[in-house]
């Protein structure tokens, strides 16, 4: 993990069904705030609110905030700009930076994950890490405030 935390607590979480009242058992929005066992904090949000005008199926942004800068990953597109995704922006004490990662990295993680499943190895991620991520998601869902 980026933070090196090995465990975390869910501090707050919410779920809602904003756009699909005909399916009351489902949620189309969820978020959670976590604090790691090393003091690092995290927030994630998932939703099904992609506007019809967006040229891809979802937004796919990741923000990593640190004490000396931050990184923003734009996986699928840079809104209002031509071209594809795989944009990396970062700001540090030296200035503002940009890297076009399209076609430069490939997808090594997914290949390693498939091989882990086939070979029962732990190269992409450990089983302990995968189970901890799943546990935290379930805990966030179970304790989530249902927004009406």
Model-assigned labels for residue ranges:
Residues 1-59, 128-132:
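Rossmann-like dinucleotide-binding domain that binds NAD(P)(H)
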Residues 47, 75-76:
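Surface loops and adjacent helix of pleckstrin homology
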Residues 50-54, 80-83, 106-107:
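A short local loop/turn or secondary-structure capping micro-motif enriched for an aromatic residue
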Residues 61-62, 78-94:
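Short polybasic amphipathic segments
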Residues 69-75:
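Broad, structure-driven detector of short, well-ordered beta-strand segments within folded domains
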Residues 98-111:
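Active-site loop of classical SDR/Rossmann-like NAD(P)-dependent oxidoreductases
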